[in-house]
Design a protein with these regions (language model features):
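Periplasmic alpha-helical coiled-coil/stalk elements that build and connect Gram-negative outer-membrane
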Residues: 3, 51-53, 182-303, 412, ...
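Sec-dependent N-terminal signal peptides
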Residues: 4-13
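Bacterial Sec-pathway N-terminal export signals of envelope proteins
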Residues: 19-78, 234, 276, 283-319, ...
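Small/polar (Gly/Ser/Thr/Ala-rich) solvent-exposed segments
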Residues: 40, 64-78, 137-147, 157-186, ...
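Transmembrane beta-barrel domains of outer membrane proteins
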Residues: 57, 157, 326-329, 366-368
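Amphipathic alpha-helical coiled-coil segments
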Residues: 41-56, 187, 193-210, 221, ...
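Small/polar, glycine/serine/threonine/aspartate-rich low-complexity segments that form flexible
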Residues: 68-154, 285-293, 339-369
Length: 488
C-alpha cells in the first residue's frame, strides 16, 4: 500500500510542478520548436540535402571499382581443330610414309644405292616416333583447359571534361540544401506564430475571466444594495429583477469565459508538447497593461524580399533551373575521361594458357562526341530554359504578393495601435461614468437602470481594451512573419 501511494505521488507531482511553473512567451516558443514533428522532418531533409551535396562533390574525384567473375563452360576453348590435332599427332608417320615412297623410287632408279637406302629405312620408325612426339607436344601445349575461368579487374575512371555537368549538379545540390534550410526557417516561423496566437489567446481569456469575476461581484453588490433599498421602500421589485437578470447573464458569461480559457490552455499545451491537463500559468496573465513599446516599421519592402523564406526558396529554385539548363546542354557536348586499371585472369593469357594468375596494367583516354541527334539536344535545352523562365515568373508574382501582404500587415498593426489608444481613452470615460453613476445611485439621483447601463459600458470598455492589447501583440507577430524575421 505504501509503495502504491508513493508511486501515485510520483505520478501526480510532475503535473503539480507543471501547473505551478510560469511560462514566458519565449519558453513556449522553445518548447513548441523542440517537439514539433514537422520541424524534425524538415531538419532531416536538411541532413539529406547535405549528404546529396557531399555526394555530388565526389564526382570531381577518380572512381575506383573492382570487378570479378567466374565461369564454368561445358567445353574448353580449342585453338586447334580436330583435323589439325590429328595431323600434328601423326606428323612423323605421315612424313616417313612419304619419305619411304621417295626412297623406293630412288632405289629403282639407282640400284647401287640400295644398301644405303636400306640403312636409312631402318631409322624411319624411330624418326617417325620422335616427330610424332614433337607434334603431340605441340597439341598438348595448345591445350587451354579453360572450362574453369576466373577474371578480375581494378578499374579507375577520372572525369576530365563532362560538358559542365558535374559543376552544374554540384550547384543544384548546394541550392537544394539552402532551400531545405529556408523551409525549416519558414516552418519555425509558422510554429512561432501559432504559439503566439495561442499564447495571447490564453492571456486574453485569463484577463476576461478576471473582468467577468469583477463584473459579477459588482452586480452581486448592487443586488444587495437594491434589496436594502427595497426594504427601505426606495426601490421597486422591478429594479431587483433587472439586476437579477444582469447577474444571471454575468454568471453565464463567466462560465463561457472559463470554458474557453480551459480549451485555450489545452490548445497551447498541445502546441508546446505539454500534458493537456497541466494548465500552465503564463507570465502575462496577471498584467493589467499589456501594451508594449511600438515596433518600428520599415519604410520599404526590400527587407521582406531579403528575409522572407518563401522568396528565398523561389530564388534558389530559379538558380536550380538555370543549372538544369547546363545539365541538359552537357549531354550533347564532348565527354572526356581518363581510364586506367589492372586486369588478371586464370588461366593466364599473357604466357600461353598458364595455370596461374597473371595480369596486365592499362591506361587510356575515352572521348565521346555526339554527332547527330535530329535536334534533340536543342529542344531539351529550350525546354529547360522555359522551366527557368516559369520559375522567374513565379518569383516575380510571389514578390508582388509578399509586398501586398507586408503592406496589409503594416496597416493592421497600425490600426491595432490606434484601436488600443481609443480603447484606453474610452475606458477612462467608462470608469469615470461608472464612478459618477455609483455615487449618484447611493444618493438616489441615478436610477438602477442607468447604473446597470454604466456597469455594462464599463465591462464593454474593459473587454475592448483587452482585445485591443491582444490584437497589438498578434498583429506585431504577423508583421514580423510577413517580413520574414519572426523569432530572429
Amino acid at each position: 500500500m505504501k509503495k502504491f501511494l508513493f508511486t501515485l505521488v510520483l505520478l501526480i507531482l510532475p503535473l503539480g510542478i507543471l501547473a505551478q511553473h510560469t511560462y514566458t512567451l519565449d519558453e513556449c516558443r522553445n518548447l513548441a520548436l523542440k517537439q514539433n514533428k514537422q520541424l524534425a522532418i524538415q531538419q532531416t531533409q536538411i541532413d539529406k540535402a547535405t549528404y546529396d551535396r557531399k555526394a555530388a562533390g565526389t564526382n570531381y574525384l577518380p572512381k575506383v571499382s573492382l570487378a570479378a567473375g567466374y565461369m564454368l563452360t561445358s567445353q574448353e576453348i580449342s585453338l586447334l581443330s580436330d583435323d589439325q590435332k590429328a595431323t600434328l599427332s601423326n606428323l612423323g608417320t605421315n612424313m616417313t610414309g612419304n619419305l619411304s615412297q621417295a626412297m623406293m623410287q630412288i632405289v629403282q632408279q639407282h640400284p647401287e644405292l640400295a644398301p644405303l637406302v636400306q640403312q636409312a629405312g631402318q631409322l624411319m620408325p624411330s624418326v617417325a616416333g620422335a616427330v610424332n612426339g614433337m607434334g603431340q607436344s605441340v597439341v598438348d601445349a595448345l591445350h587451354t583447359d579453360t572450362r574453369n575461368a576466373v577474371a578480375g579487374a581494378v578499374l579507375l575512371t577520372q572525369p576530365l571534361y563532362m560538358g559542365g555537368k558535374i559543376r552544374a549538379y554540384n550547384q543544384i545540390t548546394h541550392y537544394a540544401e539552402e532551400i531545405a534550410q529556408e523551409k525549416l526557417r519558414g516552418g519555425r516561423q509558422e510554429v512561432i506564430l501559432q504559439v503566439d496566437q495561442a499564447y495571447w489567446q490564453v492571456v486574453s481569456l485569463a484577463n476576461k475571466e478576471r473582468l467577468a469575476i469583477s463584473y459579477r461581484d459588482m452586480l452581486q453588490q448592487l443586488n444587495k444594495d437594491v434589496e436594502a433599498l427595497i426594504r427601505e421602500g426606495v426601490a421597486t421589485r422591478a429594479n431587483a429583477l433587472n439586476v437579477s437578470v444582469k447577474l444571471n447573464e454575468a454568471e453565464m458569461t463567466l462560465l463561457k469565459v472559463q470554458d474557453g480559457l480551459t480549451l485555450a490552455r489545452m490548445l497551447l499545451c498541445q502546441i508546446c508538447g505539454l500534458p493537456l491537463e497541466s494548465s500552465p500559468q503564463l507570465a502575462e496573465e496577471k498584467m493589467e497593461d499589456l501594451s508594449a513599446v511600438p515596433m518600428p516599421l520599415a519604410s520599404t519592402d526590400s527587407l521582406s524580399w531579403q528575409w522572407r523564406p518563401e522568396l528565398r526558396q523561389l530564388e534558389k529554385a530559379v538558380n536550380i533551373y538555370d543549372a538544369k539548363v547546363q545539365v541538359q546542354r552537357s549531354d550533347y557536348l564532348p565527354h572526356l575521361a581518363l581510364m586506367g586499371g589492372y586486369a588478371t585472369t586464370y588461366p593466364s593469357l599473357v604466357n600461353g594458357f598458364e595455370k596461374r594468375f597473371r595480369g596486365i596494367w592499362n591506361v587510356g583516354v575515352t572521348l565521346k562526341v555526339p554527332v547527330w541527334n535530329w535536334g534533340e539536344g536543342r529542344y531539351k535545352v529550350r525546354s529547360a530554359r522555359a522551366e527557368a523562365q516559369i520559375a522567374r515568373l513565379n518569383l516575380d508574382e510571389a514578390r508582388e504578393k509578399v509586398q501586398l501582404q507586408v503592406s496589409q500587415s503594416r496597416l493592421r498593426a497600425n490600426e491595432a495601435e490606434r484601436k488600443l489608444r481609443l480603447s484606453e481613452h474610452n475606458l477612462e470615460q467608462a470608469e469615470e461614468n461608472l464612478r459618477v453613476a455609483q455615487a449618484g445611485h447611493k444618493e438616489g439621483v441615478v436610477s438602477t437602470t442607468d447604473l446597470l447601463g454604466a456597469q455594462t459600458a464599463w465591462l464593454q470598455a474593459h473587454s475592448e481594451r483587452i482585445d485591443a492589447q491582444i490584437d497589438v501583440m498578434i498583429t506585431r507577430s504577423m508583421l514580423d512573419k510577413a517580413l520574414g524575421r519572426l523569432g530572429e
